[in-house]
Every structure is written in C-alpha cells, then in structure tokens.
Amino acid sequence: MRLFVLTRHAHSTLNREGRVNGDPGVSGPLTPEGKGQAEHLGVQLSALPVDLCVYTRFGRTLETAELALAGQTVPRVVEPLLDDVDVGELEGATLEEYRAWKHEHRRDEPFPGGESLDDAALRYAKAFRKLLARPERTVLVVCHEIPVRYALNAAAGSDDLDGPEHAVSNATPYLFDDGALERAAERVEQITRSGRRAQPKRGE
C-alpha cells in the first residue's frame, strides 16, 4: 500500500497576524511555536520510511519540511499546483475581510486580480492525480490548509469541500492511501464542476 501524508505547514508569522497570503513571494516564516510544531511532526513521522517530500513555493512549507525531516536525506520536490489560493488584491487582508468577501461572492468568482476557489480546487485535484502518478511508496506533502481540507472532506464523500472538517491544524499529519487520494481527486472535480453548472447567473 502506498501512503500520502498531507500536512499543513507549521504556524507562521502570517497565521499569528491573522492575514491571508496567496503570493509565494511574500515572506511568512515560521514562528518559534511553528518551529516546535515542525520538529514534533518529525517525531510523529519517525516510524515512516518517507521516500519523497513535496512542498509548495511558499517558504513556510519548505521550512516545515526541513525541520520535520532534519538529518534525513529525503528527496524534495516543489509542486506549484499545491500553492495556496491566489487572492489577488486581498493579499495581506485580515481573515475577517477574506471571509466577508467569500460570503458575498460565488466560488466560481475570482478574487480581484487572483483566482477563484473553484479554479484552485481543480488545481488541487490535478495535483492529487500528479502525486498518484509518482512511483514513491511514502510521500510527505507539506502544503496549506485549503488543499488538505478539500482532500479530507472529498475523500469522506462530503458534498461540501469546506465541511464537515473545517479546521486543519498546523503541522498535523493526515494519512491517505491510494484509494482515498483518488476519491479526493474525483470528488473535488465532481463537486466543483457540478457546482459551476448549478450556480445561477446574477439577476436570475
């Protein structure tokens, strides 16, 4: 059996400030608390023979991976398809501002200057399929809250990618076998595409 360990990066300065970040060029290093979380993740993974580590273009994911895998010679690969959602002009906004925008707009509407949540969801499904196509047996995937949340809810068969698993803790390992990750990819695609067909145009 193959194993994919999906985890959100450890606690970052942007988490501490309660601000959103979808631009990998913006710095958001781990806090002292986050560094401790990443090291504890390494302890949790110590019994697993990790063959590959996949992380995103955001520095906090690489920093988490390096601390979790300290002392190990595990190959590492950057996967931009798992990058956090590009929120465009909402870069640096508070979580309250971000949630207010989401509440007022449909999932297929892009953030001003960014991408839509639907586009991000399909990107994540593509990333899951890309992971499934790899030959390694045990893969650590250090990414962000939204792709992990979508994978958890989709694999469980939920009709809502944002629930029932709403909160994804920092540096917590979530285990998926081939079947679970395949179900996640299929369900994310199904929900997103059916939602696009079902959503009425404004004024209807």
Residue ranges and their predicted role:
Residues 4, 137-145:
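Generic beta-sheet signal
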Residues 12, 147-148:
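Short active-site segment of divalent metal-dependent hydrolases/proteases
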Residues 14, 28-29, 70-126, 165, ...:
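Phosphate-handling substructures
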